[in-house]
Amino acid sequence: MVDNGSTDATQDELRRIAAASGVTITIVMEGRPGLAFARNAGMQRARGRVLVFIDDDCEVGRPYLGDLQRHYAKGDRVVRGGRVELGNPGDLPFTVKRSPVPEVFTPGVHPGGFVLGCNMTMQSEVAARIGRFDERFGAGAPLQSAEDTDYLVRAYALGIPVEYVPDMTVYHHHGRRERAEIERLHRSYSLGNGALCLKHLVKAPWLVKHFFWTVRSAMAETLFGPRFDPDLQLSHWPIVLMNLTGAARFARLWLAGRAMPTELPEVGEAVSRLERGP
């Protein structure tokens, strides 16, 4: 469990949980705020053959570990995500993945949401090859989101399959019940995705196609075409605007000297000799 700079009694609560648990729990303190920092801290100290990333507002379904063991029985070298359901039916149906059929990623679909970061798995050898999460992305970072999508794009560029399976379920208690909250999150996701377009312009130019397809859909929406999400009344236009904003923000970060190498080889080397937690 990673405590990502909490200022309340989280550390004491984690210690209580660890002491009462029937399995070994390693508590990792990561003072730098940001989801990507937390993911990297956990990944660096993980001991298992298979890494499982979930979020702090998610509950793992009872069959999860059995599903996980079955899917990795053959030692697949993939990035694999599972179903994400609402943890509370009162929350709005956003940041969920309910497809009932298995899927394999291709550039014909946008990678955002194909596998959600709150339910993403891979073998440690795969993580070693891809490297660390880009800490400029994700909640609490300048680019606000898309650290998981960036990871999928990097995996695909390396020839690592990205798969979705309709089991391996987690329940997401995101707590958002007002449309305004979903609109803010929608814009945040779009900002991160715009940054990805510029970051991967050379290695994944197909991302730009999705931007132009969104522009086309936005123009059609103006002429009484369908919205991006009719049920939640989410428009294509904020996606266009925030994609451009995200690309501009990424450019500023790069020009300011904060760019990180995509492969991050020093982390890939570190995963093979994982640091043991306290």
Describe the predicted segments one by one.
Residues 3-12, 58:
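A conserved acidic beta->alpha catalytic loop
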Residues 115-131, 136-168:
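A short, conserved alpha-helix in the catalytic core of glycosyltransferases
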Residues 82, 96-114:
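Short, flexible, basic/aromatic active-site loop/helix in glycosyltransferases
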Residues 63-94:
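Conserved donor NDP-sugar-binding/catalytic core segment of glycosyltransferases
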Residues 184-191, 198, 202-278:
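Non-catalytic, C-terminal membrane-associated alpha-helical segments of glycosyltransferases
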Residues 30-46:
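Glycine-rich, basic loop-to-helix element that forms the pyrophosphate-binding segment
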Residues 1-5, 26-30:
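Short beta-strand/loop segment that forms part of the nucleotide-sugar
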